[in-house]
Amino acid sequence: TPAPYAPQPQDGSEYMDAPQPRGAAESHGNPPSQAAPEGTTRRGLLDKLTARLTGLYDAREARSIALIALAELAGLPLSALLTDPGAPMAADGFEAMAAQLAAGRPVQYVVGHTEFYGHRFTVREGVLIPRPETEELVSWVVHDERRARALLDVGTGSGCIAASLALALPGAEVCAADLSDAALAIAAENCRTLGARVTLRRADALGGLDEAFPGPFDAIVSNPPYVPQSDLAAMHANVRGYEPREALFVPDDDALRFYRAIARAGRRMLRPGGKLYFEIYERSAGQMRLLLGEEGYTDTEVREDLNGKPRMVCSRMK
Protein backbone atom coordinates (compact mmCIF):
# COMPACT_ATOMS: atom_id res chain seq x y z
CA THR A 1 0.00 0.00 0.00
CA PRO A 2 1.56 3.33 -0.96
CA ALA A 3 2.15 5.77 1.87
CA PRO A 4 -0.35 8.61 2.05
CA TYR A 5 0.70 11.66 0.11
CA ALA A 6 1.12 14.57 2.52
CA PRO A 7 -0.59 17.66 1.14
CA GLN A 8 1.29 20.92 1.34
CA PRO A 9 -0.19 24.21 2.57
CA GLN A 10 -1.76 26.49 -0.01
CA ASP A 11 -2.31 30.21 0.38
CA GLY A 12 -5.77 31.67 0.05
CA SER A 13 -9.19 30.17 -0.19
CA GLU A 14 -9.34 26.81 -1.89
CA TYR A 15 -11.67 27.99 -4.64
CA MET A 16 -10.55 31.57 -5.11
CA ASP A 17 -7.79 30.35 -7.42
CA ALA A 18 -7.37 27.02 -9.14
CA PRO A 19 -4.53 25.23 -7.31
CA GLN A 20 -1.24 24.67 -9.01
CA PRO A 21 -0.01 21.10 -9.63
CA ARG A 22 3.02 20.09 -7.66
CA GLY A 23 6.47 19.53 -9.05
CA ALA A 24 7.53 16.29 -10.60
CA ALA A 25 10.70 14.26 -10.90
CA GLU A 26 14.37 14.99 -10.33
CA SER A 27 16.51 16.62 -12.98
CA HIS A 28 17.79 14.38 -15.71
CA GLY A 29 21.27 15.49 -14.75
CA ASN A 30 22.16 16.91 -18.16
CA PRO A 31 25.18 19.20 -18.18
CA PRO A 32 24.53 22.94 -18.53
CA SER A 33 23.85 23.85 -22.13
CA GLN A 34 25.60 26.47 -24.21
CA ALA A 35 24.45 30.03 -23.77
CA ALA A 36 21.53 31.13 -25.93
CA PRO A 37 19.85 34.47 -26.57
CA GLU A 38 17.95 35.45 -23.43
CA GLY A 39 14.52 35.35 -25.07
CA THR A 40 14.96 31.73 -26.09
CA THR A 41 16.47 30.36 -22.89
CA ARG A 42 14.43 28.57 -20.29
CA ARG A 43 14.85 31.54 -17.97
CA GLY A 44 13.93 34.00 -20.70
CA LEU A 45 10.70 32.23 -21.60
CA LEU A 46 9.89 31.73 -17.93
CA ASP A 47 10.32 35.43 -17.22
CA LYS A 48 8.30 36.35 -20.30
CA LEU A 49 5.37 34.11 -19.39
CA THR A 50 5.48 35.16 -15.73
CA ALA A 51 5.25 38.80 -16.78
CA ARG A 52 2.21 38.08 -18.96
CA LEU A 53 0.42 36.38 -16.08
CA THR A 54 1.30 38.77 -13.26
CA GLY A 55 -1.68 41.01 -13.94
CA LEU A 56 -4.02 38.04 -13.59
CA TYR A 57 -2.34 36.31 -10.63
CA ASP A 58 -0.03 37.42 -7.86
CA ALA A 59 3.69 37.08 -8.55
CA ARG A 60 4.12 33.75 -6.76
CA GLU A 61 1.20 32.11 -8.54
CA ALA A 62 2.20 33.55 -11.89
CA ARG A 63 5.69 32.07 -11.53
CA SER A 64 4.31 28.70 -10.46
CA ILE A 65 1.90 28.55 -13.39
CA ALA A 66 4.63 29.56 -15.82
CA LEU A 67 6.97 26.85 -14.52
CA ILE A 68 4.34 24.14 -14.90
CA ALA A 69 3.34 25.27 -18.38
CA LEU A 70 6.91 25.52 -19.67
CA ALA A 71 7.88 22.16 -18.19
CA GLU A 72 4.98 20.60 -20.08
CA LEU A 73 5.87 22.47 -23.27
CA ALA A 74 9.50 21.34 -23.08
CA GLY A 75 8.73 17.81 -21.89
CA LEU A 76 11.03 18.34 -18.90
CA PRO A 77 10.69 17.95 -15.13
CA LEU A 78 10.25 21.21 -13.27
CA SER A 79 13.68 20.85 -11.69
CA ALA A 80 15.38 21.01 -15.10
CA LEU A 81 14.02 24.50 -15.68
CA LEU A 82 15.53 25.59 -12.39
CA THR A 83 18.88 23.79 -12.44
CA ASP A 84 19.84 24.80 -16.00
CA PRO A 85 17.88 28.00 -16.63
CA GLY A 86 20.29 29.30 -19.25
CA ALA A 87 19.77 26.35 -21.57
CA PRO A 88 18.18 27.14 -24.95
CA MET A 89 14.52 26.28 -25.33
CA ALA A 90 12.48 26.13 -28.50
CA ALA A 91 9.56 28.52 -28.42
CA ASP A 92 7.30 26.33 -30.57
CA GLY A 93 3.82 26.41 -29.06
CA PHE A 94 4.78 29.08 -26.53
CA GLU A 95 2.50 31.82 -27.83
CA ALA A 96 -0.54 29.55 -28.08
CA MET A 97 -0.04 28.28 -24.53
CA ALA A 98 0.65 31.77 -23.20
CA ALA A 99 -2.52 33.10 -24.82
CA GLN A 100 -4.65 30.43 -23.13
CA LEU A 101 -3.12 31.12 -19.74
CA ALA A 102 -3.38 34.90 -20.16
CA ALA A 103 -7.08 34.45 -20.94
CA GLY A 104 -7.50 32.84 -17.52
CA ARG A 105 -7.73 29.20 -18.54
CA PRO A 106 -6.46 27.13 -15.60
CA VAL A 107 -3.02 25.65 -16.18
CA GLN A 108 -4.37 22.20 -15.30
CA TYR A 109 -6.75 22.36 -18.26
CA VAL A 110 -4.01 23.75 -20.49
CA VAL A 111 -1.57 20.92 -19.74
CA GLY A 112 -4.38 18.36 -19.31
CA HIS A 113 -3.46 16.95 -15.93
CA THR A 114 -2.77 17.63 -12.26
CA GLU A 115 -1.18 15.85 -9.31
CA PHE A 116 -3.36 14.52 -6.51
CA TYR A 117 -2.38 12.28 -3.61
CA GLY A 118 0.82 11.25 -5.37
CA HIS A 119 -0.85 10.35 -8.67
CA ARG A 120 -1.32 12.17 -11.96
CA PHE A 121 -4.94 12.70 -12.99
CA THR A 122 -6.23 13.79 -16.36
CA VAL A 123 -8.47 16.85 -16.09
CA ARG A 124 -10.46 18.65 -18.74
CA GLU A 125 -13.27 21.18 -18.81
CA GLY A 126 -16.27 19.38 -17.41
CA VAL A 127 -14.63 18.20 -14.20
CA LEU A 128 -13.58 20.17 -11.16
CA ILE A 129 -9.83 20.57 -10.71
CA PRO A 130 -8.80 18.55 -7.60
CA ARG A 131 -7.76 20.71 -4.65
CA PRO A 132 -5.10 20.08 -1.98
CA GLU A 133 -7.81 20.29 0.70
CA THR A 134 -9.43 17.21 -0.76
CA GLU A 135 -6.16 15.32 -0.36
CA GLU A 136 -6.53 15.94 3.36
CA LEU A 137 -9.99 14.37 3.29
CA VAL A 138 -8.57 11.32 1.48
CA SER A 139 -5.79 11.03 4.07
CA TRP A 140 -8.38 10.99 6.85
CA VAL A 141 -10.38 8.22 5.18
CA VAL A 142 -7.27 6.16 4.41
CA HIS A 143 -6.12 6.41 8.03
CA ASP A 144 -9.46 5.55 9.62
CA GLU A 145 -10.86 3.01 7.13
CA ARG A 146 -7.96 0.57 6.77
CA ARG A 147 -10.29 -2.37 7.44
CA ALA A 148 -13.13 -1.14 5.26
CA ARG A 149 -14.68 -3.65 2.89
CA ALA A 150 -16.69 -1.21 0.77
CA LEU A 151 -16.44 2.55 0.18
CA LEU A 152 -18.54 4.92 -1.93
CA ASP A 153 -17.45 8.26 -3.40
CA VAL A 154 -20.40 10.50 -4.30
CA GLY A 155 -19.81 13.14 -6.97
CA THR A 156 -16.55 11.63 -8.13
CA GLY A 157 -15.69 14.16 -10.86
CA SER A 158 -12.22 13.26 -12.13
CA GLY A 159 -12.24 10.17 -9.92
CA CYS A 160 -9.46 11.57 -7.75
CA ILE A 161 -10.99 10.50 -4.43
CA ALA A 162 -12.19 7.08 -5.57
CA ALA A 163 -9.01 6.13 -7.43
CA SER A 164 -6.79 7.34 -4.59
CA LEU A 165 -8.79 5.30 -2.08
CA ALA A 166 -8.72 2.21 -4.29
CA LEU A 167 -4.94 2.43 -4.65
CA ALA A 168 -4.31 3.15 -0.97
CA LEU A 169 -6.83 0.57 0.33
CA PRO A 170 -6.61 -2.37 -2.10
CA GLY A 171 -8.64 -4.61 0.20
CA ALA A 172 -11.73 -2.43 -0.15
CA GLU A 173 -14.29 -2.45 -2.92
CA VAL A 174 -14.55 1.16 -4.08
CA CYS A 175 -17.58 2.52 -5.93
CA ALA A 176 -18.12 6.01 -7.31
CA ALA A 177 -21.12 7.96 -8.55
CA ASP A 178 -21.60 11.07 -10.66
CA LEU A 179 -24.48 12.56 -12.59
CA SER A 180 -22.24 13.91 -15.36
CA ASP A 181 -21.45 11.57 -18.24
CA ALA A 182 -18.40 13.69 -19.09
CA ALA A 183 -17.08 13.36 -15.56
CA LEU A 184 -17.66 9.61 -15.53
CA ALA A 185 -15.72 9.26 -18.78
CA ILE A 186 -12.74 11.14 -17.35
CA ALA A 187 -12.95 9.20 -14.08
CA ALA A 188 -12.95 5.92 -16.01
CA GLU A 189 -9.93 7.08 -18.00
CA ASN A 190 -8.05 7.94 -14.82
CA CYS A 191 -8.91 4.66 -13.14
CA ARG A 192 -7.70 2.71 -16.17
CA THR A 193 -4.47 4.68 -16.41
CA LEU A 194 -3.69 4.30 -12.71
CA GLY A 195 -4.82 0.70 -12.44
CA ALA A 196 -7.40 1.60 -9.80
CA ARG A 197 -10.31 -0.83 -9.44
CA VAL A 198 -13.39 1.35 -9.09
CA THR A 199 -17.02 0.63 -9.99
CA LEU A 200 -18.41 3.74 -11.68
CA ARG A 201 -22.12 4.40 -12.17
CA ARG A 202 -24.29 7.33 -13.14
CA ALA A 203 -26.36 8.39 -10.16
CA ASP A 204 -27.85 11.57 -8.72
CA ALA A 205 -26.72 12.50 -5.22
CA LEU A 206 -30.06 14.24 -4.68
CA GLY A 207 -32.16 11.15 -5.33
CA GLY A 208 -31.88 7.47 -6.21
CA LEU A 209 -28.35 7.03 -4.91
CA ASP A 210 -29.26 3.93 -2.92
CA GLU A 211 -30.91 2.39 -5.98
CA ALA A 212 -27.68 2.66 -7.97
CA PHE A 213 -25.53 1.54 -5.03
CA PRO A 214 -27.56 -0.38 -2.42
CA GLY A 215 -24.47 -1.18 -0.35
CA PRO A 216 -23.84 -1.88 2.42
CA PHE A 217 -20.84 0.43 2.74
CA ASP A 218 -18.45 1.03 5.59
CA ALA A 219 -18.11 4.68 4.61
CA ILE A 220 -19.48 7.20 2.14
CA VAL A 221 -17.15 10.00 1.07
CA SER A 222 -18.14 13.15 -0.79
CA ASN A 223 -16.88 16.55 -1.83
CA PRO A 224 -20.20 17.85 -3.14
CA PRO A 225 -21.01 21.34 -4.42
CA TYR A 226 -21.06 23.65 -1.41
CA VAL A 227 -20.10 27.22 -2.37
CA PRO A 228 -23.10 29.58 -1.99
CA GLN A 229 -24.19 31.13 -5.26
CA SER A 230 -23.70 34.58 -3.74
CA ASP A 231 -19.95 33.91 -3.57
CA LEU A 232 -19.70 33.68 -7.36
CA ALA A 233 -18.51 37.26 -7.72
CA ALA A 234 -15.62 36.60 -5.31
CA MET A 235 -14.31 33.69 -7.34
CA HIS A 236 -11.20 34.14 -9.44
CA ALA A 237 -11.88 34.51 -13.16
CA ASN A 238 -10.20 31.19 -13.94
CA VAL A 239 -12.74 29.44 -11.70
CA ARG A 240 -15.81 31.39 -12.85
CA GLY A 241 -14.99 31.11 -16.51
CA TYR A 242 -13.80 27.53 -16.86
CA GLU A 243 -14.67 25.13 -14.05
CA PRO A 244 -18.13 23.51 -14.04
CA ARG A 245 -20.43 25.63 -11.90
CA GLU A 246 -22.67 22.67 -11.15
CA ALA A 247 -19.73 21.08 -9.31
CA LEU A 248 -19.14 24.17 -7.18
CA PHE A 249 -22.25 26.18 -6.40
CA VAL A 250 -25.46 25.67 -4.45
CA PRO A 251 -28.46 27.95 -3.87
CA ASP A 252 -27.97 30.27 -0.91
CA ASP A 253 -31.33 29.23 0.54
CA ASP A 254 -30.51 25.49 0.42
CA ALA A 255 -26.73 25.32 0.69
CA LEU A 256 -26.68 21.96 2.52
CA ARG A 257 -28.95 20.17 0.05
CA PHE A 258 -26.33 17.62 -1.06
CA TYR A 259 -25.21 16.79 2.48
CA ARG A 260 -28.80 16.29 3.60
CA ALA A 261 -29.62 14.00 0.67
CA ILE A 262 -26.47 11.92 1.07
CA ALA A 263 -26.95 11.63 4.84
CA ARG A 264 -30.53 10.40 4.36
CA ALA A 265 -29.49 7.90 1.72
CA GLY A 266 -26.63 6.84 3.97
CA ARG A 267 -29.07 5.58 6.59
CA ARG A 268 -30.12 2.92 4.08
CA MET A 269 -26.67 2.33 2.55
CA LEU A 270 -24.24 2.24 5.47
CA ARG A 271 -23.48 -0.71 7.69
CA PRO A 272 -24.32 -0.20 11.38
CA GLY A 273 -21.70 2.20 12.68
CA GLY A 274 -20.74 3.26 9.16
CA LYS A 275 -19.41 6.75 8.59
CA LEU A 276 -19.89 9.77 6.39
CA TYR A 277 -16.86 11.84 5.38
CA PHE A 278 -17.51 15.22 3.79
CA GLU A 279 -15.54 18.19 2.57
CA ILE A 280 -17.47 21.27 3.69
CA TYR A 281 -17.73 25.02 3.25
CA GLU A 282 -15.60 26.78 5.84
CA ARG A 283 -18.55 28.67 7.32
CA SER A 284 -20.95 25.72 7.58
CA ALA A 285 -19.35 23.58 10.31
CA GLY A 286 -21.98 24.44 12.93
CA GLN A 287 -24.84 23.85 10.52
CA MET A 288 -23.32 20.52 9.51
CA ARG A 289 -23.19 19.35 13.12
CA LEU A 290 -26.88 20.15 13.52
CA LEU A 291 -27.86 18.55 10.22
CA LEU A 292 -26.01 15.31 10.90
CA GLY A 293 -27.48 15.06 14.39
CA GLU A 294 -30.98 15.58 13.00
CA GLU A 295 -30.38 12.89 10.38
CA GLY A 296 -29.42 10.25 12.95
CA TYR A 297 -25.63 10.49 13.08
CA THR A 298 -23.37 10.88 16.09
CA ASP A 299 -19.74 11.39 17.13
CA THR A 300 -19.42 14.20 14.61
CA GLU A 301 -15.88 15.52 14.24
CA VAL A 302 -14.86 18.62 12.29
CA ARG A 303 -11.26 19.07 11.18
CA GLU A 304 -9.44 22.09 9.83
CA ASP A 305 -7.41 22.12 6.65
CA LEU A 306 -3.78 23.20 6.57
CA ASN A 307 -4.92 26.80 6.24
CA GLY A 308 -6.73 26.53 9.57
CA LYS A 309 -10.24 26.55 8.07
CA PRO A 310 -12.96 24.06 9.07
CA ARG A 311 -12.96 21.91 5.94
CA MET A 312 -13.83 18.28 6.74
CA VAL A 313 -16.40 16.46 8.81
CA CYS A 314 -16.88 12.83 9.79
CA SER A 315 -19.99 11.44 11.46
CA ARG A 316 -21.04 7.93 12.46
CA MET A 317 -24.44 6.39 11.96
CA LYS A 318 -26.08 5.50 15.26
Locate the predicted segments by residue.
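S-adenosylmethionine
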Residues: 168, 172-173, 177-317
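Intrinsically disordered, low-complexity repeat/linker tracts enriched for polar/charged residues
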Residues: 3-10, 14-16, 20-22, 26-28, ...
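Glycine-rich, flexible loop/turn motifs
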Residues: 77-78, 85, 103-107, 112, ...
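N-terminal auxiliary segments of SAM/dcSAM-dependent transferases
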Residues: 28-30, 34-111
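SAM-dependent Rossmann-like transferase core, predominantly class I methyltransferases
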Residues: 96-189, 202, 207, 314
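A general structural signal for well-ordered alpha-helical segments in protein cores
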Residues: 46, 66, 94, 104-107, ...
